[in-house]
A protein has these predicted regions:
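Class I SAM-dependent methyltransferase Rossmann-like catalytic core
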Residues: 1-11, 25
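Conserved class I S-adenosyl-L-methionine
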Residues: 9-21
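Local beta-strand N-terminus motif with an aromatic residue
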Residues: 10, 102-104
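Conserved SAM-binding loop of SAM-dependent methyltransferases across substrates and taxa
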Residues: 20-38
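Conserved beta-strand positions in the Rossmann-like core of class I SAM-dependent methyltransferases
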Residues: 42
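S-adenosyl-L-methionine
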Residues: 47-101, 113
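C-terminal substrate-binding/active-site "lid" region of AdoMet-derived donor-dependent transferases
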Residues: 99, 112-190
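A conserved beta-strand element that flanks and buttresses the S-adenosyl-L-methionine
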Residues: 107
Length: 190
């Protein structure tokens, strides 16, 4: 992913699911080593505790001028941003959007059960020519009993993923790259 972003030189980046900052550290290192700094880098994280870690990482790499750490539930942030976009299209001054309304590169992480939903939420934020990166959710194996809550979440998440790929196949170019530990998926609007 780091290499792909190095080639893209994306000016506007959104990372969904910053966690404790492993991937963010790779990206900050890229910005530092390549001398390439994006216009804006939004890191969305559901938990405030992790946001503290991300803030420390941001200050260590001196990314305050271009980084926005956003804490909140993705569904709500997307809804608020779409409402902001509609309100600002009327010409009214409505402040800043919770997350940037368009990005050249979007990285979507999250649980296997939520990954398809998160990708679907973020696709409208993809700029023309932009790339959305995610990992394919784990595929369920064997029989899963209906009482197995975790197993059923995995099955339902994977089924939602298959439905998403089928529907996006009409509107996006989709590439799959098997890697150690999973399959990287890239989506570009047709």
């Amino acid at each position: 992913m780091r290499d792909a972003l190095a080639r893209l030189k994306a000016q506007r980046i959104i990372e969904v699911g910053g966690g404790i900052g492993h991937r963010s550290a790779w990206l900050y290192d890229l910005f530092t080593e390549d001398g390439f700094t994006p216009e804006r880098y939004d890191i969305i994280e559901n938990g405030a505790k992790f946001a503290v870690i991300l803030h420390r990482l941001m200050t260590r790499y001196e990314g305050e001028s271009y980084t926005k750490i956003v804490v909140g539930v993705l569904d709500a942030l997307v809804g608020e941003t779409l409402a902001w976009k509609a309100a600002s299209s009327t010409g009214l001054e409505v402040g800043d959007a919770p997350i940037q309304p368009e990005a050249d590169a979007i990285i979507v992480d999250g649980t296997n059960a939520q990954r398809a939903k998160n990708v679907e939420l973020m696709l409208p934020f993809l700029a023309p020519g932009g790339v959305l990166f995610t990992l394919e959710p784990d595929m369920p194996v064997g029989d899963v009993e209906p009482e197995d809550v975790d197993g059923m979440e995995l099955v339902n998440g994977f089924n939602a993923w298959i439905e998403l790929i089928q529907s996006c196949n009409e509107t996006h170019h989709i590439g799959f790259m098997p890697l150690f530990g999973g399959t990287l998926v890239a989506m570009v609007r047709k």
